[in-house]
Regions:
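Nucleic-acid substrate recognition interfaces
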Residues: 1-154
Length: 154
């Protein structure tokens, strides 16, 4: 049986890296909110026709309209889509959970998740490698990681 473990480490980003992370947080939030808005519109349009199969856009659709989305990790944007899908499924499964809400810039807790593909997320002694970031991020590794890194949430 495969066992997944979560490790929590503190990172010490430089000023340039902080700007990159805040840009990524903003782009993930934007894509999530745009996709939620599109889903609400599609649901309103198809309300009268239950047989109509609704096709939802992917984050790639928004990259044509918003060029700055190309500067951040595409897997972070894809994970925003997966989070929205999960929120929708949870809502339709159990109405008491509540309808998915738009993400706010004012929320002090902001994060994004990226997946490891061929070593794009890796830890070298005291340094963390993150996709689309040119430099390594300083990290405090206080215990040994066993196994393979599947994803990282920043």
């Amino acid at each position: 049986m495969i066992q997944l473990k979560a490790y929590k480490f503190r990172i010490y980003p430089s000023d340039e890296q902080k700007i990159f992370f805040s840009k990524t947080f903003g782009c993930v939030r934007l894509v999530y909110n745009l996709m939620l808005n599109d889903r609400i519109k599609a649901y309103e349009e198809s309300k009268g026709n239950p047989d109509k199969k609704i096709k939802y856009p992917t984050p790639a659709k928004y990259k044509k309209e918003y060029e700055f989305l190309k500067e951040v990790d595409s897997l972070a944007l894809a994970n925003a889509q997966m989070n929205l899908d999960k929120a929708y499924k949870n809502f339709f499964r159990n109405k008491s959970i509540g309808f998915p809400k738009f993400k706010s810039k004012k929320n002090p807790v902001q994060s994004y998740t990226t997946n490891n593909q061929n070593g794009t997320v890796n830890i070298f002694r005291k340094w963390l490698k993150v996709p689309k970031l040119k430099e390594l991020v300083k990290i405090k590794v206080h215990r040994k990681i066993e196994g393979i890194i599947k994803s990282a949430t920043i």
